[in-house]
């Protein structure tokens, strides 16, 4: 089945910034994909092409990337006449067309938009639901429903409070299904709102980019205490565990970590050494039901990562460290830096490379968590992706804001469609049994 037309346009993400949307037509219909973008981006990510030479949209326009799809990728792909079911060949052709290591010529946002639209068209051609088609591309015979990691307290670059760490998450690992996980997650979320309102007032219930609350606290331990209290009030102690995304690259300064980095006058004497940070994490793990910590150190602090990973049995997730890039993942595997990959399709810029990164991590005994970005759209691709890749865990924000709920609602539909065949990862979310 050949591609008839490809058309890209500039739309807006959940933060009001421009992003790329691609429409692809085959004889089976029109298939649309939109590309997300991040706030705390790793320096090693594939290049998201922005119109930095234009003042429009605060220099964040994507008309160059859109033009690259319409004037370069579209005619070349249509002329090449590769079947839409040959995802790997189409992705490789676009990567070769770009010819740079980090996709800086055409833009990772241009290539990814086409790549995701091709996948949706391929699923239709194969007569399969998108999640089943992705499972086939990844070589999986079965699929699994993921544990959602709801980001319910926002800090770091995602919120205007003083909290250094970016995300405090709840994982309903004790649920028996994804549907029950949604019930547990939303009930804890609403109880958390009541707790925050009681302690800090109504304006502390404003939400951040990903739908989590952003109370003006600075003590990270306090964030964990608020979660623990909300879980207890909701009646789910033991059924809900805690995850964190520290995004430590954001507050890494001169080899140390500044937990007061949003204060321009923060005292250097209070900055923590890498070992002091590691000890703080160990303290947190001993006091709270923490099962996952993401980016606990700077993206190039290769020396400190393995120390924490080897000294704890919880999940240590690489995001800015690995940026879904096979080269960085191999380096992290060799140095035993972490034991889980955060998978973001726009960090690497094509579906085929995302699947390769996922399999590389899984083959090394790592867990894999599929993730949204802080600048999201109504596109639900990652919901089908996490089910098809059988990773067992997804983070796509709080149960609040339509750009986040779109993914969770799609997962509810998938579980409903699977019926009695649906399996929920639960406590085995790190290494789900397919």
Swiss-Prot record:
Gene3D superfamilies tied to this protein: Enolase-like C-terminal domain, Enolase-like, N-terminal domain
Family matches, as InterPro entries: Enolase, Enolase-like_C_sf, Enolase-like_N, Enolase_C, Enolase_CS, Enolase_N
Alphabetized GO MF terms: magnesium ion binding; phosphopyruvate hydratase activity
Cofactor(s) the protein needs: Mg(2+)
PANTHER family listed in its UniProt record: ENOLASE (PTHR11902:SF1)
Keywords, sorted A to Z: Cytoplasm, Glycolysis, Lyase, Magnesium, Metal-binding
Residues the entry annotates as binding substrate: 158, 167, 294, 319, 371-374, 395
Classification via PROSITE patterns: ENOLASE (PS00164)
Provenance organism: Schistosoma mansoni (Blood fluke)
SMART domains: Enolase_C, Enolase_N
Record-given protein name: Enolase
Gene Ontology cellular-component annotations: phosphopyruvate hydratase complex
Record-annotated active site: 210 (proton donor), 344 (proton acceptor)
Similarity comment: Belongs to the enolase family.
Residues annotated to bind Mg(2+): 245, 294, 319
Record-listed E.C. numbers: 4.2.1.11
GO biological process terms on file: glycolytic process
Assembly and oligomerization: Homodimer.
